[in-house]
Amino acid sequence: MVEELMKRFDVWLVMKEPNNSRVVDNLGLCTIVTPDELKDLPSILVAPMTTLSESLPSRIECHFDDAKGYIMVDQLRAIDKFCFIKKLGELESETQVKLCDCLQEFFAL
């Protein structure tokens, strides 16, 4: 079952809006930010990833799959589990720490 494989800091290819018929515009990379203890919920909290970004405190630079990109903490969203298509890997441990620090700052405001 897919949800058993889902863990915090995993990077997944997801369908962002299941009702959107434009498949190309609807797929994207996301990293899971939901704590593993809450993986039984029907949806998972994710932060989208992009290769294009402005310099914002809520954007974390990362390297994934030999490409430089950004995790967009300011674009958090809940995605239903059936929208997760394929696990692509996991964030590096240094990036995981930066993500946790950014989440703490983001919600402390």
What are these regions (language model features)?
Residues 1-109:
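Conserved functional hotspots at enzyme active or ligand-binding sites that engage polyanionic ligands
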